[in-house]
């Protein structure tokens, strides 16, 4: 410290300040902690995640930008990754009379494939709406078949209508969407159906660390290196959704002004996140997911830094004021009508579009995307896309396709590489691609410095939970003044009102102060 001719010490510390030659001055009694939100019990996915209502449109616009950036940073897609060639393959067209079904796959990043089925209407001219359909944690995903006995039980309680079509709730939706005159891409969640490059166990059941994947070079997901690089299953799924939207919009018949995304459960998570960060989506319909309660019970729905001082209600709010519908059931969404949705309605009202948000609460059903919930979606897009289908829109039965008819892989289109080595290569590629982007941002002049601060500074702000508080947010509480010979000691609690932070602090000011200061953080 000899380089500083300082005689004033401003000391910030957790509980006490330690000096070698004197008893440590205390701000709080022994054993008492500051009333700091960061010292509270950690909030887990089953906590309470309400929306804090903004007071003005301007306040919300600023907050929305912060939350969108937080999502992107947490998911490792900040700045937006390079959009590499999709290398689209569409094959195996099946004609079902009034619609067709095709097998489609493409690369979201080089060597990593998004797989699914493309449903298209027949006998349509001109541009038609496009619908993205990510699915949740339904057994076998896109290939789901709940069987004859199970669907009969669903029919008895009014959850499904048809014994054949009801066996696949996931196939029923895109069929009806195509019959209504829309193109629908139904794609796999990582680890489901044809998306097997990263396994189901890795993506959705990870619980035990793998020493062989926790290396400083050639690491895998869920490792310290992957977390440090913000690489996650959730980030990969979100990027898959962004590229699925690229794919959909590249289809010549799709109307870019009428793009919807819908999914239930984990598919609802994917829906609200894509709709929240990608402005190209014009209608969003997350089913049985948006709530103030449980935020997503799978590793694929969580990422480091994601839900810090935010949650799913606010994520859904990012889509306002554009049309958004959602469903509730007898699950964690059962209280949406009184907790969460009223605040979303207030937000839409603030933004001048109170009629653009709707909740379809069918809490007499368990967790679902059943016939009744699908009907709500069909009516919603019929209204907002002006499809002209007679109301009420009634879903009809269809000829259900099996696994062999839906799978994208065959002798001519073999499965791509998978397993641990592929996982290592994927993580390595993502890290190197990100490094190239940040290297390109190195400031060279005033304009590039501003961009560096926006991108890199923005990432740092998200990761550390904010930057310097405004002066107006700071105050000293419980201040005490003690004369101690050649100096005066001030103690108190330095409060940051904007974050609920509270730091014990000591200020030592000499009698003959020279106007210079040293800050000691301990």
What are the language-model segments listed below?
Residues 7-17:
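Bacterial N-terminal signal peptides
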Residues 138-141, 192-196, 267-271, 291-297, ...:
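Flexible loop/turn segments at secondary-structure boundaries
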Residues 127-130, 180-183, 255-258, 279-283, ...:
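Loop/turn elements at helix/coil->beta-strand transitions in domains of secreted/extracellular proteins
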Residues 126-127, 131-242, 249, 290-300, ...:
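Cap/lid segment of the alpha/beta-hydrolase catalytic domain
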Residues 295-352:
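The feature captures the conserved acid-bearing segment of alpha/beta-hydrolase catalytic domains
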Residues 20-114, 327-504, 508-518:
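Alpha/beta-hydrolase-fold serine-hydrolase catalytic core, especially in secreted/extracellular enzymes
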Residues 1-4:
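Positively charged n-region of N-terminal signal peptides that target proteins for export
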Residues 236, 243-308:
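Primarily recognizes the serine-hydrolase "nucleophile elbow" in alpha/beta-hydrolase
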